[in-house]
Design a protein with these regions (language model features):
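Long, contiguous amphipathic alpha-helices that act as assembly "spine/axial" helices in icosahedral shell
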Residues: 84-143, 204, 295-299
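Assembly/oligomerization interface modules of large self-assembling protein complexes
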Residues: 25-93
């Protein structure tokens, strides 16, 4: 099919004819929002590459705790295995903008160069939005991805490889007391062998509307939102927690239930992943290679994001 539309003199006559003083380009400071989460962040997303368009992995059972043994007692062997093999396919994302030969050569206002800037910005926006909405935002419904045991990332019905039920779903709104309940739950979380995972709270991700509450809860010297003078343990003992926010978690850009109240705790051992088949590439195809004498600006990237397993993660929907 021959390219049509895009940037042409017919669609944007002011760009190829004299007579206007300026174009009021949109400018974005999205990435300058405080603690803005990028898809390329290597703490909230475990980064990696794929050799093909799919990524295949198993969960590991670990080896369990040591056994008490008497002198010359026959030793007990321990089974250890991998299981729940899962595959995720990488996704191609593409933007193609035709530019007529006339519009390319007669650009009076810099529209041609601006298209390149806009494509780059929208590539980053797409990466960030899709990475967050396909993992953290999807954590409670599992409508896009589930963990290898078939549950949503945040669930009270996870099953460890050795059979224990694991609950990493909480419901408390973002308050100091509820946050401590969540931190305790993360510390008490089972490992795959049914022993202590005991993950340390090191990252907090919230919709942008909860960012103020998160900062006041975490960084106040005294316990927040009360008259007591007890120390705020989150400021003293958890002072290095990464607090990040995203507009793509909130109800403006997410259709998930409880989008405005949900939040996420992670440890460094979480397995929320971003795997890249290839990064952003851009090609300008000349008009002699198209059917209607137009340039083609074609940009694309190929990647996927998904929760590899439930370990080291806890989600609260903030409903109580």
């Amino acid at each position: 099919m021959q390219p049509s539309g895009g940037h042409t003199g017919e669609l944007s006559p002011d760009a190829v004819l004299t007579g206007i003083d300026a174009v009021l380009w949109e400018e974005y400071t999205r990435e300058q929002q405080p603690q803005y989460l990028r898809a390329t962040d290597d703490f909230f997303f475990k980064q990696g590459e794929t050799e093909g368009i799919g990524f295949i992995w198993d969960e590991d059972s670990n080896v369990g705790a040591f056994e008490a043994t008497s002198e010359q007692e026959e030793l007990v062997n321990t089974d250890t295995w991998i299981g729940n093999q899962t595959t995720k396919q990488s996704q191609k994302w593409i933007k193609q903008v035709p530019i007529s030969d006339e519009a390319f050569k007669a650009d009076m206002v810099g529209k041609r160069a601006k298209i390149g800037e806009q494509v780059g910005d929208r590539a980053r926006l797409t990466q960030d939005k899709e990475a967050i909405q396909r993992t953290y935002a999807d954590a409670f419904s599992g409508s896009i991805h589930t963990t290898p045991d078939g549950q949503a990332l945040a669930s009270n019905s996870h099953v460890a490889l050795k059979g224990q039920t694991v609950d990493n779903l909480e419901t408390g709104s973002l308050t100091a007391d509820n946050l401590w309940t969540n931190v305790t739950s993360l510390a008490n979380q089972y490992a795959q062998d049914g022993e202590a995972g005991s993950h340390v709270f090191e990252g907090l991700l919230v919709p942008f509307t909860l960012y103020k509450t998160a900062k006041e809860t975490m960084n106040s010297q005294l316990a927040p939102f009360g008259a007591e003078n007890q120390i705020n343990i989150f400021d003293t003992d958890y002072g290095t927690v990464r607090i990040y926010a995203s507009i793509f978690l909130g109800s403006t850009f997410s259709n998930e239930t409880n989008a405005a109240t949900s939040y996420h705790l992670i440890s460094r051992s979480h397995q929320i992943c971003r795997k890249v088949f290839y990064g952003l590439t851009t090609a300008l195809i000349p008009p002699e290679n198209t059917a209607n004498d137009s340039y083609l600006l074609r940009s694309k990237f190929h990647e996927t994001t998904f929760p590899g397993t439930w370990t080291g993660y806890l989600g609260s929907n903030g409903t109580t």
